[in-house]
Amino acid sequence: MSLNFLDFEQPIAELDAKIEELQLVNNGQELDLDIEDQISQLREKNKEQTKKIFSNLDAWQTARVARHPQRPYSLDYIPRIFTEFDELAGDRAYANDNAIVGGTARLDGKPVMIIGHQKGRSTAEKVKRNFGMPRPEGYRKALRLMEMAERFNMPIITFIDTPGAYPGVGAEERGQSEAIARNLKVMARLSVPIICTVIGEGGSGGALAIGVGDRVNMLQYATYSVISPEGCASILWKTAEKAPTAAAAMGITAQRIKELDLINSIVEEPLGGAHRDMDVMAAHLKQAIKKDLSELEGLSKDELIEQRYDRLMSFGYC
């Protein structure tokens, strides 16, 4: 896969280009030990440069990694982590929303319910998925699947990756705020384990609507916020160009959110971000989900609900 590099990754991109150039020179010829040695040195330098850049990302750079066009989405993780995924569609009231995907699957043989936001890569796919911004029917579909999981005693696993709930007139007319609020209420009371992971953007109420859980985790370069940095900047400074300043002030990174005890853990990403190696990222995520699930399965239903309630009530300052 040819990688897309962000502007702050240009030193890495230049090293990658040099490596590719040397590989082309060496391709189809007898092994040139001198060229092989140069490639090896450049790869080591590339690795060190990547470590240096990604160990010093600011909040705005992290937000851009979270939005990377090649970053894995829910439908990239599902086949790498689960088996026998059977997608379920529709809210049984109005329509099917492709910005939310969900269905039954097995995690190492155990039945689970999966729900996640889904963005698109091509223009047609982005339109089909509404750029990952769910409408009310998407959240009502998620609610239907959660209630089904409750009936069949299946753990719920959610993947969060949305810039926010869709703010269109039609969505508001069909009860966007009610759909989100109802999900929050129901998720707080479900008696099955709920494990939520922010895999990309955790945008405001659109993220929270499938984000109330017993365990809430974030990938290393994911973000979680009440509004996008651009939206915040437009309100406070009347220009989206102040987005980097807004991102720093809002505390949107996994590290900052963990310091505030709003999430349980941070899932490590491959060097350079999840898009550099989807298989490795999926393996890390699967390990984290299995660890959380093993801890939660030992609790009774009453204990599960009580601990979830206590977790929610611990937020904020008093």
From Swiss-Prot:
Keywords for this protein: ATP-binding, Cytoplasm, Fatty acid biosynthesis, Fatty acid metabolism, Lipid biosynthesis, Lipid metabolism, Nucleotide-binding, Transferase
Subcellular location: Cytoplasm
UniProt domain CoA carboxyltransferase C-terminal: residue ranges: 34-295
GO annotations of cellular component type: acetyl-CoA carboxylase complex
Domain of life: Bacteria
Any single GO BP term: malonyl-CoA biosynthetic process
Keyword Cytoplasm: yes
Catalytic function, reaction form: N(6)-carboxybiotinyl-L-lysyl-[protein] + acetyl-CoA = N(6)-biotinyl-L-lysyl-[protein] + malonyl-CoA
Pathway the protein acts in: Lipid metabolism; malonyl-CoA biosynthesis; malonyl-CoA from acetyl-CoA: step 1/1
Enzyme type, top EC level: transferase
SS bond list: none
Signal peptide: none
EC number annotated for this UniProt entry: 2.1.3.15
One family name in Pfam for this protein: ACCA
Main subcellular location of this protein, as a coarse class: cytoplasm
InterPro entries noted in UniProt: Acetyl_CoA_COase_a_su, ClpP/crotonase-like_dom_sf, COA_CT_C
One MF term in the entry's GO annotations: ATP binding
Role summary: Component of the acetyl coenzyme A carboxylase (ACC) complex. First, biotin carboxylase catalyzes the carboxylation of biotin on its carrier protein (BCCP) and then the CO(2) group is transferred by the carboxyltransferase to acetyl-CoA to form malonyl-CoA.
Record note on quaternary structure: Acetyl-CoA carboxylase is a heterohexamer composed of biotin carboxyl carrier protein (AccB), biotin carboxylase (AccC) and two subunits each of ACCase subunit alpha (AccA) and ACCase subunit beta (AccD).
Family: Belongs to the AccA family.
Protein's recorded name: Acetyl-coenzyme A carboxylase carboxyl transferase subunit alpha
